[in-house]
Structures are given as C-alpha cells and as structure tokens.
C-alpha cells in the first residue's frame, strides 16, 4: 500500500475546483490565518485539510497501517509512504531507492544500466515503424543520460534516504571511494541540528530521516542536490 498526501495537479478537474484554495493554503498555512474575506469565502464549503490536519492524517495513516501489517506500536515501513508485510515489499521500488540497475520495457519505459539512464519513446506510431536493426541499435531511446559521479552521489543520498533505514556511510565510501562526511558533512551537520536527520554510530553507521524529517522530506532531500 502506498499512502501519500494529496497533491492537486494543475489541469485536472480537481484543480479547477480547488486550485485557488490550494494556493491560499500554501500562502497562509491554515484557514484561521487567512484574511476575513477568504475565511468567509471558504466557510461552509468542502475544504481541503490545512497543513497541520494533513500531517495529523498522515501520521494516523502510518501508525494504523504499521499496526495492521506487523502488529507494531510504531510505524516501520522500510520505504517512506509504502507499507507491506515482511517479504512482500516492492522489489522494484527498493532497487530504485538503492541504485540497483533496472531495465524498462515498452512505450515510455525508463531504464538504468551501466550508469546510463535512458527512456523509450512514448510515441506508438514512431515505435511501430522501427526495424529490428534500428531497435537493436537503440533507435527507440529518446533520452540517454550518462550519470556523472556527482549525480550518482546525489542520488545515493536523496533516494536512499527514502528508506526508513536511511543510508550507510560504509556503502557510500565503497561506491565512491570517499567518505560521506567529506562530501556532505556540512549538509548532514545542519540537518542534524535542525532535527531532520538522526545518526547511528553503532556497528553499522548510517543516517536517516527523523519523524520530523519525514514530514518535510522534500526540503531535507533537496539539500543534497547541487
């Protein structure tokens, strides 16, 4: 089960109905902080939850699902926003978060092989006219991007931190030949002080998002991008 907070996307019927409300909530945070005219405007309507209500709903969802899945008192899902019984977690998702190579087949499918990320065309008419020789030569791929070392380090951090177990410092050094602290020491120290990360220095040293960090994961993870 995947459980996320609702995002009202532009161009959808839901956005037509709630777009202005979303913008006002983003600006003011909650209905009580809005100007009187906006409070009156939304009074009695089917309103979207404000930020605090949204977080409370999310925490309740996490706790409830964790208890149903494993009988735990605290949420443990393995992956942020994803829940499964032991042994049934999505292997593709875990592979994606940990940088494992994968091959996507079919229109619009993405792959990661040999440090390169590439995507098959989403145009069916174009795809159907390719010859076997053209397909063998990779003509179906529209976007081919070879990841730089910096990009691979960034992905190791911001994708790996989507796992509740976080990222292991030893694995970072094994992959890139440099200590995690040497590359991201300042960022990690700042996020530790802000209460967004926590570190373990036991036998398997690692860092992971705190409960608060999970709430603002978009901000925390973006700190590892240059």
Functional labels for PLM-detected ranges:
Residues 204-210:
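Minor-groove-contacting beta-hairpin "wing" of winged helix-turn-helix DNA-binding domains
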Residues 1-178:
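C-terminal scaffold of the Radical SAM
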Residues 212-226:
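Short, amphipathic alpha-helical interaction segments positioned at domain boundaries
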Residues 192-203:
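A short, conserved structural fragment
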Residues 60, 156, 183-186, 219:
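Long, highly charged amphipathic alpha-helices
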Residues 169-170, 182-183, 200:
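Extended hydrophobic-aromatic, low-complexity segments
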Residues 178-193:
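Short amphipathic alpha-helical interaction segments
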Residues 115-117, 194, 219-221:
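A short, polar/proline- and glycine-enriched secondary-structure boundary/capping micro-motif
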